[in-house]
Amino acid sequence: MWSKQECIPVSLSSKLRTSPQPIEELEGSHRTFALGIAQKSERDYRLAVRVQRHELRDSSEVARIHEMARGEVDVRYVGRIVKQVPWYQSRERPLKIGLSIAHYLVTAGTLGAFVRRKSAESVLVLSNNHVLANENKAKKGDAVVQPGPFDKGKKGKDSVARLEEFVPLKSTGSNVVDAAVARLTDKLDYDPRDLQSLGRLAGVGEEITSIGGAVAKIGRTTGLRLGRVTAFEVDNLVVTYGIGNLRFDNQIEIEGADTLSFSEGGDSGSLIVDDAQRAVALLFAGGDHGGSNGRGLTYATPIDRVLTILKVNMVS
């Protein structure tokens, strides 16, 4: 049994009670010196001193450390050190394919593409129902935020779109898509074709009708991943959702290239492209087992079917 490509689960921490402390202590650690061991030669080492504040570079403290270590020091100014957050999990403007996005009550999924109604000028963002519409629970007009709430996105300041339409997920019978669109906020900048190191989106590709084809995607969790098609027209695929086990027909199966998985939780909604950077599918589910590399399999819906059902075209 397969599960939807889960949006990241939110872990809740209990409130901490603390006794009165100096404000300085409550504000956290101060940037001074980081100390470690650096190599001097093949068999010799010295003290590594990393200065984290500009005004401390020529201070008496550095001179004192130098003296205490008898000159066996490697002093370098490194400045402020910040957490490393991938661009696709950060707040990004203009909006791009592959960014973290979600309904304000969902954790985080992926912005798949920019689309437009055939008779309208408004631009819509495309992703999964379970990313933008909270598995049928959302209402038209609900806020969509970038980044998703799990990545610190907040309703209001990070709202970028309003839910426009979703294809209902059915508990009985067959599902053929997990898809939704949200209307982009007016005057919000976006780049509908940027695929980072892959180049530029080159429209919509031909329907996948054979195995072995090379594909790629940019997703909220794993970023750029390469893969290959291992099956198509997959029927009776049972996918686990919060609302139950749902059946999907006529889907595409993909495995990761080399030793990596093609997708992980949070990559839901990713646009999958072929080796000519043409859109071919919309990612929606995956599992941890299977594949020739043992890293799991990913499932996606042919993009033509998604666009047809939602009555939209890709923005190029």
Model-predicted regions and their roles:
Residues 253-254, 261-262, 273-316:
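C-terminal subregion of chymotrypsin/trypsin-like serine protease catalytic domains
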Residues 91-257, 273-275, 284:
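Serine endopeptidase catalytic core focused on the charge-relay Asp
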Residues 1-115, 123:
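Noncatalytic regulatory segments and standalone regulatory/sensor domains
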Residues 264-268:
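Short, small/polar residue-rich loop motifs at catalytic or cofactor-binding pockets
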Residues 65-67, 141-143, 200, 233, ...:
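Generic alpha-helical propensity signal that fires on short helical segments
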Residues 41-45, 51-56, 121, 271-278, ...:
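Structured catalytic/translocation cores of nucleotide/phosphate-coupled proteins
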Residues 41, 53-57, 119, 131, ...:
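Residues that cap or initiate secondary-structure elements
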Residues 57-70, 193-206, 296-299:
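Surface-exposed flexible segments
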